[in-house]
């Protein structure tokens, strides 16, 4: 894919949140509305270095709120057996399809990724099966807000219900916390402990942090 074609696709699919290098062309730059130097490749490098084995061979990954799909693609490139990416936003969903197509052409290999354009709260988890890792990067605090409004009583209940249902389908979660009342490290610690998970590793990132939770069993 030529650089001019990449630039054209990036513009057509804007606005972007995940910052991804596409053969020297960045999906988002410092003058763009959602620019965050840590979104995308920077965050993936932390996940890969701090939480994951060198290979994801024979593992299944669930990437919730996958956005443009960079963590899904990167997991597949680490030899994951299968990756399921879930994204509610229609434009981000289209970005994910484009990013997958780009990296398949760039790496010259088929990536076993399935994207689902849906609300996380509506997923048929029993049908999706079990996963070795569930990524919930910067998404838990968004669950329920499209139905009930952000941080309403109903939205917070749905977040807890979703985590409870997910806990039956994995032994490892990787999430991001912030420093608000309903998205802090302590808040999520209590939420996950109620479902049999303990904080295994915490990586501070200023006002945010990355956490690995592992099942007690």
Feature-to-residue mapping (PLM):
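Conserved alpha-helix/loop element of class I SAM-dependent methyltransferases that forms part
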Residues: 38-56
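Conserved class I S-adenosyl-L-methionine
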Residues: 59-67
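Glycine-rich SAM-binding Motif I of class I
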Residues: 69-73
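Conserved SAM-binding motif I beta-strand of class I
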Residues: 82-87
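Conserved SAM-binding loop
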Residues: 96-97
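S-adenosyl-L-methionine
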Residues: 100-126
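A short SAM/SAH-binding and catalytic strip from SAM-dependent methyltransferases
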Residues: 133-153
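Conserved beta-strand signature within the Rossmann-like core of class I S-adenosyl-L-methionine
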Residues: 170-178
């Amino acid at each position: 894919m030529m650089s001019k074609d990449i630039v054209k696709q990036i513009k057509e699919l804007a606005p972007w949140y995940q910052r991804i290098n596409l053969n020297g062309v960045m999906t988002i730059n410092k003058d763009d509305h959602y620019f965050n130097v840590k979104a995308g490749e920077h965050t993936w490098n932390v996940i890969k270095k701090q939480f994951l084995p060198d290979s994801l061979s024979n593992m299944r990954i669930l990437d919730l709120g996958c956005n443009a799909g960079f963590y899904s693609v990167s997991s597949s490139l680490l030899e994951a057996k299968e990756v399921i990416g879930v994204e509610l936003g229609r434009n981000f969903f289209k970005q994910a399809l484009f990013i997958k197509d780009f990296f398949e052409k760039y790496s010259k290999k088929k990536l076993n990724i399935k994207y689902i354009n849906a609300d996380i709260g509506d997923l048929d988890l029993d049908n999706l099966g079990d996963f070795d890792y569930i990524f919930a990067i910067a998404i838990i605090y968004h669950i329920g807000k499209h139905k009930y409004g952000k941080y309403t009583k109903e939205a917070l209940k749905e977040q807890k219900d979703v985590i409870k249902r997910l806990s039956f389908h994995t032994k490892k979660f990787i999430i991001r916390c912030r420093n608000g009342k309903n998205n802090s490290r302590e808040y999520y610690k209590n939420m996950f402990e109620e479902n049999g998970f303990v904080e295994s590793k915490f990586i501070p990132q200023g006002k945010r942090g990355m956490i690995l939770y592992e099942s007690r069993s």
